[in-house]
Amino acid sequence: MSKKYDAGVKEYRDTYWTPDYIPLDTDLLACFKCTGQEGVPREEVAAAVAAESSTGTWSTVWSELLTDLEFYKGRCYRIEEVPGDKESFYAFIAYPLDLFEEGSVTNVLTSLVGNVFGFKALRHLRLEDIRFPLAFIKTCGGPPNGIQVERDRMNKYGRPLLGCTIKPKLGLSGKNYGRVVYECLRGGLDFTKDDENINSQPFQRWQNRFEFVAEAVKTAEQETGERKGHYLNCTANTPEEMYERAEFAKELGQPIIMHDYITGGFTANTGLARWCRKNGILLHIHRAMHAVIDRHPKHGIHFRVLAKCLRLSGGDQLHTGTVVGKLEGDRQTTLGYIDQLRESFVPEDRTRGNFFDQDWASMPGVFAVASGGIHVWHMPALVAIFGDDSVLQFGGGTHGHPWGSAAGAAANRVALEACVKARNAGREIEKESRDILLEAAKHSPELAIALETWKEIKFEFDTVDKLDV
């Protein structure tokens, strides 16, 4: 006997609010922070999110009878209070894995953060976390190389890597840009980088920049005996142009390229990561535009989700903020998504903002990149917070040295090695930071000048997006 079709409109909670449901290991789980309009029950708001991000529409439709809605629908299985926020609540939603294309971060985000964010019944909506099931993770390529392969390629072990962004980031000719790269690398840095908005502008076309940078890297390697690299930004107007730039970097023998993964898009990023894996090139990822999406504490997507998605899409290094510098991010939250980048298993821990256990299986890890308003006085805290599997990037903290970029690079290298040596000797480097740096400065005039130059520079602003604990 055929099922009866009842036309009309019914409440979302009649279908999508399922508090007795026990999530499956193969389900993709999501936690949303919801703020509904006044008078709309929480269960209805949560169910509406589950419906619109999976199989639902505003009206009952006859074509539901042509499929198994009970199998395919998203299910809101739990609602929790948000500590300290009477307006909002957490909605936990389970999605069957068959709703998503294998290996496609793009498809997952299109479903979970698509039309639902424009619902009139919602004042605010924020995607706080996703639990990706192993069955989905195994279909994703992930980082093209990973932490260990990058260390082997660059022959650098036992410490954080050291880098800087070339400044001024816009306006230099290709030749002068290459000169600054050389000064930084010969001074002691492992990497230099293009900033996010250097592509191919009238003052500096990309081919010209790539050629002068390659010459600078080669010369610095010959002089120092160390492997060096520069993140050549391949982000472009079209995928074809992006791959053309990547191929040219490979022809020049460069070890690493760069992509702006949010402005460039996950489709482009996944494709470039696959190219890097095939061609043996490292991939640095910049998160330009992330704060538009993740900074509001009640609306958007938390950066931990964007970090997880990047690990799945592919990248060997990702910017994560600094905790101590000029960019947003408190310590526990930052450590939470650094764990998601580097660890093979991350347990649920609300004190770090992780709402679910996340098993990454054998997927390689991603270097966490600390960049933005940092200088030598921050070095002990950065080493303590980020650990060895990180890249510490000092832009103004290198080029702003009174003696020039090479001296700034030398100061940072001496400070880093002093902190690593003190840590390995069992000293509490954050508590003893001043003594450690001043001791090292006795043998490094570059560091002594840097410490004097930046002794009064602090970024003491309260964090906007705090953990709900």
UniProtKB/Swiss-Prot annotation:
Additional comment: The basic functional RuBisCO is composed of a large chain homodimer in a 'head-to-tail' conformation. In form I RuBisCO this homodimer is arranged in a barrel-like tetramer with the small subunits forming a tetrameric 'cap' on each end of the 'barrel'.
Originating gene: rbcL
Binding site for substrate: N115, T165, K169, R287, H319, S371
Subunit architecture: Heterohexadecamer of 8 large chains and 8 small chains.
Organism: Paulinella chromatophora
Gene3D superfamilies, sorted: Ribulose bisphosphate carboxylase, large subunit, C-terminal domain, RuBisCO large subunit, N-terminal domain
Family per record: Belongs to the RuBisCO large chain family. Type I subfamily.
Gene Ontology biological-process entries: reductive pentose-phosphate cycle
Organism phylogeny: Eukaryota, Sar, Rhizaria, Cercozoa, Imbricatea
HAMAP family: RuBisCO_L_type1
One MF term in the entry's GO annotations: monooxygenase activity
Protein name per its UniProtKB record: Ribulose bisphosphate carboxylase large chain
Requisite cofactors: Mg(2+)
Entry's cofactor comment: Binds 1 Mg(2+) ion per subunit.
TM region positions: none
Cited SUPFAM superfamilies: RuBisCo, C-terminal domain, RuBisCO, large subunit, small (N-terminal) domain
Keyword Plastid: yes
Keyword Plastid: yes
Reactions catalysed: 2 (2R)-3-phosphoglycerate + 2 H(+) = D-ribulose 1,5-bisphosphate + CO2 + H2O; D-ribulose 1,5-bisphosphate + O2 = 2-phosphoglycolate + (2R)-3-phosphoglycerate + 2 H(+)
